[in-house]
Amino acid sequence: MAKILLANGCSHVAGSESPISFVKPLSEKMGMESVNLALPGGGNDRIVRTTINHCLTNKVDFVVVGWTTYERQEVIFNEEWHHFGLGRQVPDNVNNKEQLQKLFDFMSLYCCNWNTLGLERTLIQQLTLKSFLENRGIDYLFFNAWNKFYEDVQHPAFPELLNDKYYKPFNAIFEDYEELMPEHYSELHHGNEHVHKAIAEELYEQISRTTKQRT
């Protein structure tokens, strides 16, 4: 039976505006088949929820998560999941669109404090998923796809996350590559296949290093 690499994140992990996501070449290098749950516009709430649910009901051998920006949240409206982000406009096909837009506007004003609420939520989400995966014996690699930590972070959860399975916590990988390869990025800051192949190589090297250190 093939081993399964499960990936999750936002548009960067999904491979928006690129023919491929880094997930496919990474899984091929690891000799695995891939499942990519990433959703453009999705936040860290969704990453944790869908990763845990998938691992509870499916065989998973390795998890790669590219964390996204702090302010994104999930809400249930008309029995459906909707994904909030700063300035997000509700799609026209949503019933009672005006009511959901009022909620999003309220959240933009009062629920997006990056330095307290956003940071708190993100760290607890990451620690929750880390603990879940380790409890089930599933190997993993975390990295920041977009939005990085600063070195003066003061929170009791933060030291618990700092190991070789959280790659470059003080960097945001897709932001770094935009500085290195700006000609391969769209106006919406999405990398093309050249970026994704380079990131696949970098993540594979990190996974290989950490695997050798543990054997």
Predicted regions and their residues:
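Serine-esterase "nucleophile elbow" of acetyl-processing enzymes
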Residues: 1-46, 50-53, 57, 192, ...
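Alpha-helical cap/lid subdomain in secreted, periplasmic
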Residues: 52-215
